[in-house]
Structures are given as C-alpha cells and as structure tokens.
Design a protein with these regions (language model features):
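Noncatalytic scaffold domains of N-terminal-nucleophile
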Residues: 17-35, 39, 47-240, 245-247, ...
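Short, small/polar residue-rich loop motifs at catalytic or cofactor-binding pockets
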Residues: 277, 388-391, 413, 462-464, ...
Length: 583
C-alpha cells in the first residue's frame, strides 16, 4: 500500500501532549490557559465555567489569536438535557458599513480590511463569554476572569509562536503607538530578556539604552515577558459588569480608538450588539452522530458534508490510502466551491440555512462521491451553485458529562493592530472575512459570489467548526475544534477520521500531518512530512498539484471520552505550544 511517511522522531513528542482523568479534562492552545480551566474545575466549576476561564486566559497569553476585542462560536453540551446548544458571538459589521467600503476606484484594497480602523467589526467575545457563564455555568463571572487578570498583571513569557506572529504583523502593529508599545520592543533593547526582567510600564520593553534604541520597535524574542496591566484592570471591570464593554465610558473609548484610525465603529454599534442562539448542524459518520456549527460558519457544513461523502464511498480505507486521499481532495474541492455560493449570515442571506442543509444531506453526499473519478477535476470545472486565522480553540468535558467546544478569534495575527489606549483591548480585523466584492479573495484565499458582502449588523462568514461526536449509543465521544482559517474543516475532519476509522490515540490523531484543498487556489496543501514519495507520485499522476506547506496548519484541541471506562483524555496538537490539563 502506498502510504504516508511518519517520522519516528515525532512519536516521543506526541506523548507529552496528552492528559487523562476519570473526572474531567481540558485542552487549549496554551498551557497557562489549560491550567486556568483546570483550576476552575478543581474549585467545583463545570465545563462552561472552565471554557470561559480558558477563553479569557487565551486572550492574555495568545493576544495574536483571540481576545476580548474579537468573537467566536461555541457548542455547549448539557448532559442533563442531552442537548447541544450553539452560541454565536461572532462579530458584526458596524451600522455605517457598505458593500463597497473596501473598494477604491472599483478595485479591492486589501489593506483596508486587514489593518486599521475600517477592519474592525463589533466585538462579541465579552457578551458571549458572559452569556455562556450565566446560562450554562455555576460560578460568578468575576471568578472566571480572575486567572486571566492575574496572568496579565504578572506577565507571561512569550514563545516562538508569538515571535513569528509579531513578525508577520509587524507593519500593522507599527502603525498603532499603543499596540507597538505593548507587543513590540525598541530596537536596541534586550529583546530576549529573561522572563521577569523585561517590561516597563504596561508590558513595554526595558527603557531604551543608547542611540540605536530610538528606531522602530521589533518583535521580542522568545522568553520576553509580556505584561498587560491595563488589560488586567479591564478584565476585572468586566468580571463585575460585562455590559461595561458595550455601554458607557469604556464603550466610547473602544469606538473612539477605531474611528481615530479611520473606522466607522460607534458606541451605538456596541450597545446594539446581541449574541445569537443557533440550531446545531447534525450529520452522521459510520454510526456516529456529528454536531457542528451552522451559518454564519460554513466550516461545520463542509466538515459534515465531507465526512458523509467519504462514508458514501464504502468501508474505511487503510490509513492514508492514496485512493482515499484523492477522494478527500475531490470532495473537499466541491464543498468549498459550494461555500462560495449562498453561504453568509443567515439573518441577512436567506439562502444560507438552506445551503447548509443541502450540504449536509445524504443525497448530496452520494452525488459528490459519485462525481469522484480517477483523475483530479480542475477547480475551473467546479463552479459554485447560483447565489440566492488565526484563531484559537478550547475543548472541555467535565465530571457530569457536560462539554464545550469553543473557537474564538481576532481573525488575522493581532487583528486590526489597534489597542484601545489605557485598556489593553486589542481590536479584531474581522471585516476581512467579508467579501470585498464578488469573486475576490480574502486573506485566506476564499472567494464568494455576493451573499457575504458587508452590510450593517451583518456577521461575516466563518470557517470555525467547533464539533462534537456522539457514539451509536448517544453518549459523547469527542469534543474538538481548531484554528486555521479556511483549513479548519480539514483539520477537524482528519481528527474525526483518525479516531473513528483508525482508532488512533488522541494525540496521534491530532498530530498526524494533514492535507487540504479549498477549491481556489487549485492546489493540495501538504503539511511537512505529510506524504511519502510514492503517495505524492500517485496523486500527481491523477492530476493533483501538490504544494508543500512551510508549517503545520491548524492547532486542534480535543477531549475524548473512553466508551468503556468513561475516562476523559485530552490532547493538544503536538507540533504546537498547547498542553492539556486535568483537575
């Protein structure tokens, strides 16, 4: 059999990214966030409490990926009800938004939607976290915010991931004095200061020394301590009153910061923000029920449609079988083409809900599988139907069987690059998830046909796919999700396939290199060590164009419940910085 090369050197690393307990477990993208959640569980909190604590902590330790100036989506499983709730706290477009707001002389200007004031959508994270704690949790919000506030106050040493993100976002961060002071260090300062030695004021580097220090700021080296005292104060304020983010002096400061950089966000936009309760999307895969997020995410529909179409091809193939990989790519290509059609905010795009139902139907699964031939279909021959990140993830299962899969984001690395002075709040650049014009691509290369244009109060389309898998007996098996923009459905699908079809240990299921295709560009993205030479040749012989990724895409976090013992096994992507924890 032609298969996939898997370096033996990776196996010992996998073993350090798993934790198990008979009671509860949590997996997040950062050890400090996992420990914050585990601490809440130890203190008697439930899965919702732990997820909220982890989300606030991630806002501190991974500001490039998520924060209280962003938004997200979450599935919450309440065991006593045997019900999955879908909470939408996605950002929305300000009331002054227009379909052509990112066009100049009729052409899209990408920088307008990816950095600065116009890129800022109305944040939903604080309202979403507060609602989750109120509806599903057991602890006061102030208790859930406190671990994050302490991390912000004391500071956290940054890792290589932070350094690389700051390097990528450097031009944007340098445009905002507050963001540059908080997240960068002066040229000539000790950018690699030992933890605890850096940090003047609210997280800036040590005072400059010498003439060379007068230049522009640069990304700190791993080990530098990020201190965010303003954010600590803001978090404690929100713990007492989360509505302070949306009304009053703090809301006016948030709006003023965006408008000072050319944005249209207003205090009235913040006051008008509301979360949405959605109905989860449901599908099936080899005797398991799969729940994921509906529009305004297209990720859940792509994930379920992909799994069901693969099952329609017959019994599970051998691990990394070349014919299976070919089918995976061909089906995913077609699903992403359908995404470009009617998908958008269901409150503004009437066809979005129907498109999601069709994409997750058994009939479409059979049709897509039947369309897979022996050779690759060029993307140009796969048309969308007529139209009518950088992110982070938390998975938790508690002792009562409650579970949360929560994905949160500020969109691109460090969002808009705008920090609200005196608050530590980094604002999102979620407006780039809209289409600047029909047929134009966003930062992830995704195109649309008109249903996802900006409009007042509209939620941008997303790929976030918080997911839960239930066994044939109805019991929870898996809670998982991932960041990664357009690659999220692929990442989550590989996690499900590796657990359900191949019975892999959870850490190996998440750490096995992945492939991805999103219709346009017409390439198969392959992670490092993703395919052996024989498999590459076989796929290329079918007409696929392979593109080697420089690094793994996605950063999945999952908790699995052992059907036989009930033990909770948590795992983090072993090639990243996350670590799971147990109470």
């Amino acid at each position: 059999m032609v298969g996939m090369g898997f370096p033996a050197l990776l196996l010992p690393v996998l073993l350090s990214h798993v934790a198990a307990s008979p009671r509860a477990a949590v997996a997040t993208a950062h050890p400090a966030a996992s420990e914050a959640a585990a601490g809440v569980l130890r203190a008697g909190g439930n899965a919702a409490d732990a997820a909220v604590a982890a989300a606030f902590a991630l806002a501190v330790v991974e500001p490039m990926s998520s924060g209280i100036g962003g938004g997200g989506l979450a599935l919450v499983y309440v065991a006593r009800e045997d019900r999955v709730h879908a909470l939408d706290f996605r950002e929305v477009a300000p009331a002054a938004s227009r379909p052509d707001m990112f066009l100049r002389d009729g052409a899209p200007v990408n920088s307008l939607s990816r950095c600065g004031g116009l890129s800022v959508a109305v944040p939903g994270a604080v309202k979403g976290y507060a609602e989750m704690a109120r509806r599903f949790g057991t602890r006061p919000l102030a208790d859930l915010v406190e671990p994050a506030a302490r991390l912000a106050e004391r500071g956290v040493p940054v890792g290589r991931k932070y350094h690389l993100a700051a390097r990528d976002a450097l031009p944007c961060l340098r445009q905002d004095a507050e963001a540059a002071r908080l997240f960068l260090v002066p040229v000539g300062a000790d950018a690699g200061a030992r933890p605890g030695t850096g940090g003047g004021g609210d997280g800036s580097a040590p005072a400059p020394r010498g003439p060379a220090a007068e230049g522009a700021r640069v990304p700190p080296d791993p080990g530098w301590r990020l201190v965010q005292r303003d954010l600590a104060r803001t978090l404690r304020t929100l713990g007492r009153d989360p509505e302070a983010f949306y009304r009053g002096p703090l809301a006016r400061r948030i709006a003023a910061a965006a408008r000072a950089r050319g944005g249209v966000l207003s205090a009235e936009d913040l006051a008008a923000y509301r979360t949405r309760q959605r109905d989860p999307l449901w599908g099936s895969y080899r005797g398991h029920r799969v729940a994921s997020f509906p529009p305004p995410s297209a990720g859940g529909a792509i994930l379920i449609g992909l799994l069901q179409a693969l099952e329609a091809g017959g019994p599970a193939r051998a691990w990394r079988d070349e014919a299976f990989l070919h089918a995976f790519v061909e089906i995913e290509k077609r699903l992403f083409a359908r995404r470009a059609g009617a998908f958008g905010d269901p409150d503004h795009a009437p066809g979005a809900a129907a498109a999601a139902r069709e994409m997750t139907s058994p009939e479409l699964a059979a049709r897509l599988r039947a369309e897979v031939g022996e050779r690759a279909t060029p993307s140009a021959a796969v048309e969308p139907p007529p139209a009518p990140g950088h992110t982070t993830h938390v998975s938790v299962v508690d002792a009562e069987g409650n579970a949360v899969a929560l994905t949160a984001t500020v969109n691109l690395q460090f969002g808009s690059g705008i920090v609200v002075p005196g608050t530590g709040i980094l604002l999102n650049d979620e407006m780039d998830d809209f289409d600047a014009a029909p047929g134009t691509a966003n930062a992830f290369g995704l195109e649309g046909t008109g249903a996802n244009l900006p409009a007042p109060g509209k939620r941008p389309l997303s790929s976030m796919s918080p997911t839960m898998v239930f066994g044939g007996d109805g019991r929870l098996l898996l809670a998982l999700g991932s960041p990664g923009g357009s690659t999220i459905p692929s990442t989550v699908a590989w996690g499900v396939l590796n657990v359900v079809d191949h019975g892999m240990p959870l850490d190996q299921a998440l750490g096995t290199p992945r492939i991805h295709h999103q219709w346009k560009p017409d390439v198969v993205v392959v992670e490092p060590f993703g395919l052996d030479a024989a498999t590459r040749r076989a796929l290329e012989a079918r007409g696929h164009v392979l593109q080697d990724g420089a690094a793994p895409f996605g950063n999945p976090q999952a908790v699995r419940v052992d059907p036989a013992t009930g033990w909770r096994e948590a795992a983090s992507e072993p090639r990243d910085e996350g670590r799971p924890a147990v109470p």
